[in-house]
Amino acid sequence: MEIIKDLPEVFEEFAEQRQKSFLMMKELKDKGTPVVGAYCTYFPKEIAMAMGASTVSLCSTSDETIPEAEKDLPKNLCPLIKSSYGFAKTDKCPFFYFSDVVVGETTCDGKKKMYEYMSEFKDVFVMELPNTQGPEALKLWKKEIIRFKEYLEKRFEVTITDEDVRKAVKIENEARKALKRLYEVMQHDPTPISGHDLFKVLYGSTFKLNRSEIAGEVNALVDKIEAEYASGKMLEKKPRILITGCPIGGATEKVIRAVEDNGGVVVTYENCTGAKSIDRLVDENAEDIYQAIAERYLAIGCSVMTPNPNRFDLMGRLIDEYQVDGVLEMTLQACHTYNVETRAIRKFVNEEKGIPYINVETDYSQADVGQLNTRIAAFIEML
């Protein structure tokens, strides 16, 4: 597969993938394809894919429906939860509307309670995610994955075979490998593309309803980026920033813009929509495929885990491999687990990796754009 279009046009196509998928969703439903929506990187999408379902990301990233959500939820709750619930309650999210079932998980307290309210108007299946990563937790998580499979079989009157699951694992692994290849173009110094363009592809790929298309499209994009870089097309050398913290997208892209409008370049994202979601593969050759899926997903380093060594391991590797000059952590207001973990992250970045760190706390409004630009510009100037 070869890309004929110019790179900016390709990046915009990925940026518009969410809107495109709105239209495709109705076509899928008309054909009778089941749709399974989810809110979290811990969602083992291969199980739903194995029965022929389309999987879609539901997390909302706009403050549009927060006032409606606050009629049921407290004002001092994380904006991601309020926005997600608001879009679901008002039927303003086509993905939620067309989902036959929504899969939740016991990550943070706010989400757990949100799923209770959401289940009043939608089929919601909540997976019991352990908040630790030891052997006993792994046993529980494997049982939950099998319970999810059995729920889908009963709900949709289908049989999900091990062979179906292995096929889905292979498709998703190929997508992860391709996205990781894309990620790695940012190891070049100077970078071939902006961090915002990288993010458009990463975020847009989460709304691809046909997961088997991702690998081919992204690999072709990487080939084009590398060819243009080899011919001398690249950005100027800039301070290299790693973004970590809460899920990023939509309204919070203001943080990426603040970095890149003020002389920096985002070379890597440790967040859920970034390296966390593509760093590990499922072992396709494992004798027990459900055990392999459980191991891969439980190893994700989220702040809901106690302790949370995998987040620090991944961040340390990213800092080294991407020659990071500074780490920017974005925490959402009232996200307790990420806010609490900022102290440990700051210490790790400053003392173990020996580079500067800044934490910015924000929400889904645009009211703090000026303040963000001021703080982030000062941070980049210091590097």
Q: Predicted segments — roles?
A:
Residues M1-P34, I146, E150-I278, N308:
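A charged, amphipathic alpha-helical module
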